[in-house]
């Protein structure tokens, strides 16, 4: 595969992931991740296999940095990894992610831990907004 073909494939996969996320995840959830930018590229996943991916720059309550969603075409599933703002991977790759669970998984990694009640989330969001307001003064 030529360099141009690889770039085209990476963009195609990134657009596919974005479409699947927007089709399966509430827009308010997507907005809560504080996506500041996105891109397409290639990354070596948990098995060392090079895969096309979507790269999101996020600023959520739980994670600020990069989220990489890579398509494992051989298994037809996604692999997800988090990176801090310095570019260091945070934790292990999460594999075997299907498209129907991708949005909720990303939300639990970026913005809202699994099991958190709506009331706790609202309180945490309000506190985070208050702190950000203080820091801007």
Describe each model-derived feature in a short phrase.
Residues 74-87:
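Short, surface-exposed beta-strand/strand-loop-strand elements in extracellular ectodomains
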Residues 60-62, 73-75:
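A generic beta-sheet turn/junction motif
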Residues 63-67:
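Short, surface-exposed coil-to-beta transition loops
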């Amino acid at each position: 595969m030529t360099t141009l073909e690889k770039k085209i494939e990476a963009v195609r996969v990134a657009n596919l992931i974005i479409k699947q996320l927007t089709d399966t995840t509430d827009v308010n959830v997507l907005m809560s991740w504080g996506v500041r930018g996105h891109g397409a590229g290639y990354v070596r996943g948990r098995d060392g296999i090079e895969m096309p991916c979507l790269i999101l720059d996020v600023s959520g309550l739980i994670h600020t940095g990069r989220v990489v969603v890579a398509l494992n075409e051989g298994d037809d599933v996604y692999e997800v990894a988090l990176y801090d703002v310095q570019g260091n991977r945070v934790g292990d790759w999460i594999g075997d992610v299907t498209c129907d669970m991708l949005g909720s998984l990303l939300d639990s990694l970026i913005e809202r831990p699994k099991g958190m009640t709506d009331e706790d989330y609202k309180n945490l969001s309000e506190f985070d907004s208050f702190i950000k307001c203080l820091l801007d003064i």
